[in-house]
């Protein structure tokens, strides 16, 4: 069961108009995040990023946290996801317009949401990084949206294949480290954590933000900037972040080995991340949504 424009329906019954500008011109954005025992982690940050993107695309839609929580609770029940552990995709496209390809504000967006049951034990615990020959494209606007424009990522995925143990790493046109195909990238050298800055054209990832705001809690400095590949390849450890996969260490990038276990910073950040998830579940009641079934 999925949600489309205020209604819950079977996937086979869902219909999107061929005149939706999300389909015709790629005008749409989405958020992907994770539910832990029915609770969405860092939802406020996902909403904040979504609202910024909608404003940039001139899609008029008020993102109501209360409505999203109700939507998620109902989708969990309708899909019989009893433990509340799921992957969520919330998608908002421009919707139908009869004005053609002209500058306009979209006031009838298409809102779609679906959840997939997630088994934590099925997720990878580590990754191998491969530097991509295809370069990261620049954002279509002034900043990277989590939008329908995924051609650059698709070409990158074709280059490295579909092995879930491998993540492709983009460089910018001038050779600076950018981001992964589905992740942000971090590394530690000595007592400092490094990650590419937003001016490399990367997505402002939610888990990336978590690390930037909490690095001091594990006693490490954090710097953002434009860094050559050599900085990553000479690091003491490296890892990737993703809202569903969380914080995943790289065991190697190209021919550089970082070891088979999480490094000092990776382990500390993983523990901090898990702690915040547990605190959230405790504060929000965790499986309480099941009592209303």
From Swiss-Prot:
InterPro entries: Aminodeoxychorismate_lyase_IV, Aminotrans_IV, Aminotrans_IV_CS, Aminotransferase-like, BCAT-like_C, BCAT-like_N, Class-IV_PLP-Dep_Aminotrnsfr
Entry's Gene Ontology molecular function annotations: 4-amino-4-deoxychorismate lyase activity; pyridoxal phosphate binding
Enzyme class: lyase
Function field: Involved in the biosynthesis of p-aminobenzoate (PABA), a precursor of tetrahydrofolate. Converts 4-amino-4-deoxychorismate into 4-aminobenzoate (PABA) and pyruvate.
Gene3D superfamilies tied to this protein: 3.30.470.10, D-amino Acid Aminotransferase, subunit A, domain 2
GO biological process entries: carboxylic acid metabolic process; folic acid biosynthetic process; tetrahydrofolate biosynthetic process
Annotated protein name in UniProt: Aminodeoxychorismate lyase
Domain of life assignment: Bacteria
One Gene Ontology term, aspect cellular component: cytosol
Complexes and interactors: Homodimer.
EC number: 4.1.3.38
Knockout consequences: Requires p-aminobenzoic acid for growth.
N6-(pyridoxal phosphate)lysine modified-residue sites: 146
UniProt pathway: Cofactor biosynthesis; tetrahydrofolate biosynthesis; 4-aminobenzoate from chorismate: step 2/2
Family: Belongs to the class-IV pyridoxal-phosphate-dependent aminotransferase family.
PROSITE patterns: AA_TRANSFER_CLASS_4
Cofactor(s) named in the record: pyridoxal 5'-phosphate
Pfam families cross-referenced by the UniProt entry: Aminotran_4
Catalysed reaction, written as an equation: 4-amino-4-deoxychorismate = 4-aminobenzoate + pyruvate + H(+)
Keyword set, alphabetical order: Folate biosynthesis, Lyase, Pyridoxal phosphate
């Amino acid at each position: 069961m999925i949600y489309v424009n205020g209604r819950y329906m079977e996937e086979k019954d869902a219909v999107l108009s061929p005149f939706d500008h999300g389909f015709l011109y790629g005008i749409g954005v989405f958020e992907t995040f994770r539910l832990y025992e029915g609770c969405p982690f860092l939802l406020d940050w996902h909403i904040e990023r979504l609202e910024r993107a909608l404003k940039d695309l001139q899609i008029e839609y008020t993102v109501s946290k209360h409505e999203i929580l109700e939507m998620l609770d109902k989708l969990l029940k309708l899909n019989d996801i009893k433990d509340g552990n799921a992957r969520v995709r919330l998608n908002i496209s421009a919707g139908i317009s009869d004005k053609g390809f002209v500058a306009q504000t979209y006031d009838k967006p298409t809102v779609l949401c679906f959840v997939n049951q997630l088994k934590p034990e099925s997720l990878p615990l580590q990754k191998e990084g491969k530097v991509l020959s295809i370069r990261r494209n620049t954002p279509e606007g002034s900043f990277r949206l989590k939008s329908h424009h995924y051609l650059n990522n698709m070409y990158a995925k074709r280059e490295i294949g579909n092995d879930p143990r491998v993540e492709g790493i983009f460089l910018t046109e001038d050779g600076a480290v950018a981001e992964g195909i589905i992740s942000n990238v971090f590394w530690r050298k000595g007592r400092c954590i490094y990650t590419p800055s937003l001016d490399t054209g990367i997505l402002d990832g939610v888990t990336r933000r978590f690390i930037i705001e909490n690095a001091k809690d594990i006693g490490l400095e954090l710097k953002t900037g434009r860094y050559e590949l050599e900085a990553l390849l000479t690091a003491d450890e490296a890892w990737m972040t993703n809202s569903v996969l969380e914080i995943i260490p790289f065991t190697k990038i190209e021919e550089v080995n970082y070891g088979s276990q999480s490094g000092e910073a990776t382990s500390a950040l993983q523990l901090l991340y898990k702690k915040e998830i547990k605190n959230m579940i405790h504060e929000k009641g965790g499986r309480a949504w099941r009592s209303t079934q």
